[in-house]
Amino acid sequence: YEPGYEYWVYTKDIKVPTYFKLTKIGTEKWNHKMGYWIRTGEFESDILIDRDFNLVDGYSSMKIAHIKGIEKVPVYFVD
């Protein structure tokens, strides 16, 4: 995988570190992110993962995908 290119991967293959799971997304931020997804069908924030498929950024987008039962999501790999 090359950094800077969009790839589609299964959400089940992305490993979400515990520190993301322990972080509460603020209500205002969550409502904004979910509203954006409902209006556009796209995530407002990119999902960034490393070469081992560990989530680096985009936890709110991953959470939306999980809640909505989305099986594959667009991601960008970072070094």
Regions inferred by a protein language model and the residue ranges of each:
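Short, charged/polar connector segments at secondary-structure boundaries
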Residues: Y1-D79
